[in-house]
């Protein structure tokens, strides 16, 4: 939904700058990547995108905004959480032990019920999930490195799922300024001064 709103902004020829208000503790990689892709397209049109952080700019919230032209954060904004996790619930024990229901799976192949929650994952499935999480983490640290003009090892040093206050994020290079949304709007206006 939010990606569509940004796409509509991108298609509006009267837009000269965008202030992106981020107030998110995170979300799915797919949704974050869709939103980031739309922001990238806005920037390719030469339109500055300035981020303004509210209470949170963590995980997916940071993913979508790391490449903004300028990032404003409140001193206490929870920022970063550059990390990835995945989980697949296993309710088989609860069904058997508490509800006294046994499950008999019938599958087309060994891994067809991997996401079915009715059994624990086997080692091959755990290895697959771990590789997937590590691949996404590598992408995340790479896009942060590009957006914040840092090296991937420098990002990894401050990432690993940790959360920083806005003031700490400023000190380590994850944001550019401590300021309010009004500061971000003022900066956006100055960035387009004279642009028609």
Listing of model-derived features with the role each one plays in the protein:
Residues 1-49, 56-147, 195-196:
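Small-residue-centered hinge/linker elements
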Residues 70-74, 173-184:
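Short, well-structured beta-strand/strand-turn elements
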Residues 186-196:
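C-terminal intrinsically disordered, low-complexity extensions immediately downstream
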């Amino acid at each position: 939904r939010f990606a569509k709103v940004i796409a509509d902004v991108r298609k509006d020829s009267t837009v000269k700058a965008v202030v992106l208000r981020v107030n998110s503790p995170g979300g799915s990689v797919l949704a974050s990547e869709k939103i980031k892709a739309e922001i990238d397209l806005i920037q390719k049109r030469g339109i500055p995108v300035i981020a303004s952080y509210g209470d949170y700019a963590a995980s997916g919230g940071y993913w979508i905004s790391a490449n903004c032209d300028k990032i404003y954060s409140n001193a206490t904004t929870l920022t970063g959480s550059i990390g990835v996790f995945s989980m697949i619930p296993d309710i088989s024990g609860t069904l058997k032990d508490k509800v006294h229901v046994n499950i008999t799976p019938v599958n087309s192949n060994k891994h067809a019920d991997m996401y079915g929650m009715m059994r624990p994952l086997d080692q091959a499935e755990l290895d697959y999930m771990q590789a997937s999480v590590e691949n996404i983490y590598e992408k995340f640290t790479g896009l942060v490195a590009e957006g914040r003009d840092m090296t991937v090892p420098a990002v990894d040093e401050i990432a690993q799922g940790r959360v920083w206050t806005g003031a700490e994020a400023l000190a380590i290079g994850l944001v550019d300024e401590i300021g309010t949304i009004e500061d971000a709007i003022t900066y956006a206006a100055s960035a387009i001064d004279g642009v028609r």
